């Protein structure tokens, strides 16, 4: 399986979710299944079937997280030599030359991406266009809404 790039924060969030699923959610579901079994006939027991469905989702998510963590390539951008280039994990401030709007993004792994928090996936059109660029570079990025021209104002390794 291919290495999955993620930041330290992203790996920690996945570990926290895994711990929660294993230590809290899994026991809750097991208890719900046991309680539903006590109600008798399992064929027409909606509580039992709902709990079993939850168990399937929970176990699937646990396996998914474990696979991602085992294949994770955790990158601590603060330990990278700062050569001023946009790399995975970097925080980049850009100026949209069409709208004069300034925006700051952090380039993260797919699981960490949250556009509302300005965390963009390394595989997004914006990140792909910015990777390798330096401060003062101008780049045209093809987005679903059309071509957008950005100027890189600042590159930080936070």
UniProtKB/Swiss-Prot annotation:
From what superkingdom does this record's organism come? Bacteria
Q: Which PROSITE patterns match?
A: GREAB_1 (PS00829), GREAB_2 (PS00830)
Give the GO biological process terms: DNA-templated transcription elongation; regulation of DNA-templated transcription elongation
UniProt KW keywords: DNA-binding, Transcription, Transcription regulation
Q: Please indicate if the UniProt record lists Glycoprotein as a keyword.
A: no
* Pfam families assigned: GreA_GreB (PF01272), GreA_GreB_N (PF03449)
| Protein's UniProt keywords contain Transcription | yes
List, in alphabetical order, the Gene Ontology terms for molecular function in this entry.
DNA binding; RNA polymerase binding
Query: What family is it from?
Result: Belongs to the GreA/GreB family.
Q: Provide the function of this protein.
A: Necessary for efficient RNA polymerase transcription elongation past template-encoded arresting sites. The arresting sites in DNA have the property of trapping a certain fraction of elongating RNA polymerases that pass through, resulting in locked ternary complexes. Cleavage of the nascent transcript by cleavage factors such as GreA or GreB allows the resumption of elongation from the new 3'terminus. GreA releases sequences of 2 to 3 nucleotides.
State the NCBIfam families in the record. Answer: greA, PRK00226.1-2, PRK00226.1-4, PRK00226.1-5
Q: Which HAMAP family match?
A: GreA_GreB
Q: What name has this protein been given in UniProt?
A: Transcription elongation factor GreA
